Swiss-Prot record:
Lineage of source species: Bacteria, Pseudomonadati, Pseudomonadota, Alphaproteobacteria, Rhodobacterales
Reaction catalysis annotation: (E)-4-coumarate + ATP + CoA = (E)-4-coumaroyl-CoA + AMP + diphosphate
The UniProt record lists the keyword ATP-binding: yes
Name of the protein in its database record: 4-coumarate--CoA ligase
Membership in a protein family: Belongs to the ATP-dependent AMP-binding enzyme family.
Residues of the signal peptide: none
Keywords in alphabetical order: ATP-binding, Ligase, Nucleotide-binding, Phenylpropanoid metabolism
Alphabetized InterPro entries for the sequence: 4_coum_CoA_lig, AMP-bd_C, AMP-bd_C_sf, AMP-dep_synth/lig_dom, ANL_N_sf, ATP-dep_AMP-bd_enzyme
Enzyme Commission no: 6.2.1.12
Record function comment: Converts p-coumaric acid into p-coumaryl CoA. This is necessary for the activation of the photoactive yellow protein (PYP) chromophore.
A matching Pfam family: AMP-binding
Single GO BP term: phenylpropanoid metabolic process
Keyword ATP-binding: yes
């Protein structure tokens, strides 16, 4: 299972700095789950710890109960997450995470794992399932490196030259991994993780030669800023479908190039474009035969229906399933509806997308206290649903709105 002989630095999938960013991102994700359950405090979050105590070196950060609020059982859960992401069991190194308690020691251990595994390394990402639950998806280092080369080709085919990466998305998501970890590692570029900063804070970091990695939701957060990017900045958006508002907000910032990437956790990147009205072009590393796409011989099953044009470009027609994307997360309207129907005073409910958030229409008995029911529903949603899956707007009616044909109508 391991590579033959030591690897040269240029043959490794990730550099040490990228491994560190991934570890921080995985720890933060584990803590976010615990924070929602009230088991850790905001002051114990790894992001806060790295910004306090005189700005200690990240390598010296202790991964323990006193520092990050992780007791022995919570440590087991974290170790399982980190070991599973990097597939440390392939090199029999996963148990060392339990005895090494500094962030730098974890990074060194994972770096050693990659030295042993080489191109046989594997990574497991989780889909952004907000309601149905995340699903693990494993990708080989070879496939990820192939896509990384495709990204580099797209970015270097014309100016400006990218000299640094600013990422506004979590590093352990496949989009963040490819663009803010693998790509800069392979090109020898500096990368900064800014996912926890405000929109204005992100913009203050930008300088000429940067690649800014965001989602449509993030780019639209810049709309209210009276700000223009420095010259020669490239923007990229993915994680959810871009809209006219996404492109308007991004264009107002004045990037030299703006890339829209289509793909998923299951497939990796599939297509890209630089203008909203253009069709997507397939990434350079993909093979297409009879409208079937593959990467390194592995067929890629798309979650959307697409239409091909005569020049080999494609347009996305819509999802094959009933999943919506909200702020970069997959949301099942049916699952949200089931949560709302737990209230005994709700006779029926319907949920759909309303701009960037969800809206719900609630059927209640005539004369029911709608304000009181809305308070109850918002409390239920807060307890049982992550933020992207919580309806932002409620409308009440005695019957759900329907068309003359009996189909559910918009409201």
């Amino acid at each position: 299972m391991t590579a033959e002989g030591p690897l040269a630095p240029e043959d490794r999938v990730l550099d040490r700095e990228a491994i560190g960013r991934l570890c921080v991102s995985l720890i933060a994700a584990e803590q976010q789950d615990l924070l929602r359950e009230g088991r850790v405090g905001h002051h114990q979050m790894i992001g806060a710890r790295l910004l306090t105590a005189g700005h200690p070196s990240p390598d010296d950060l202790l991964i323990d109960e006193d520092t990050l609020g992780l007791d022995s059982l919570l440590m087991l859960s974290l170790v399982t997450r980190v070991a599973g992401f990097f597939h440390l069991s392939d090199s029999n190194t996963e148990d060392y995470l339990l005895v090494r308690r500094r962030l730098g020691e974890w990074v060194d251990l994972i770096d050693h794992h990659h030295t042993l595994m080489g191109p046989k390394a594997r990574f497991t990402f989780a889909t952004s399932g907000s309601t149905a639950g995340p699903k693990p998806v494993t990708h080989s280092a070879a496939a990820l490196l192939s896509e990384g080369q495709a990204i580099a080709k797209i970015l270097t085919e014309r100016p400006p030259e990218v000299r640094r990466v600013l990422s506004c998305v979590p590093a352990h998501h496949i989009y963040g991994f490819l663009w803010s970890c693998l790509f800069p590692s392979r090109r020898g570029l500096e990368a900064k993780q800014l996912a926890n900063l405000s929109a204005s804070g992100i913009m203050r970091h930008a300088r000429s030669g940067d690649l800014v990695v965001g989602t449509p939701f993030i780019w639209e957060q810049f709309a209210d800023l009276d700000y223009r990017l420095p010259g020669d900045v490239v923007g990229v958006t993915s994680g959810a479908p871009s809209t006219a508002e996404t492109w308007r907000c991004a264009s107002a910032l004045g990037p030299a190039r703006m890339l829209d990437i289509y793909g998923s956790t299951e497939t990796g990147g599939i297509g890209w474009r630089e203008r909203r009205d253009d069709p997507f072009r397939t990434l350079p590393d993909l093979a297409c035969f009879h409208d079937t796409l593959s990467r390194l011989g592995r067929r890629l099953d798309l979650q959307d229906e697409i239409a091909w044009d005569k020049d080999g470009g494609f347009t996305i027609l819509g999802r094959k399933d009933e999943i919506l994307q909200v702020a970069g997360s997959n949301v099942s309207p049916a699952a949200v509806r089931d949560i709302l129907l737990r209230n005994p005073r709700v006779r029926d409910a319907a949920v759909r997308l309303d701009g960037r958030r969800l809206k719900a229409v609630i059927s209640v008995a005539e004369g029911a206290d709608e304000a009181e029911i809305e308070i109850e529903l918002r409390a239920t949603a807060a307890r049982h649903l992550p933020a992207p899956a919580r309806p932002d707007r409620f409308l009440f009616a005695t019957e759900l709105p329907r068309t003359g044909a009996g189909k559910l109508a918009d409201w």
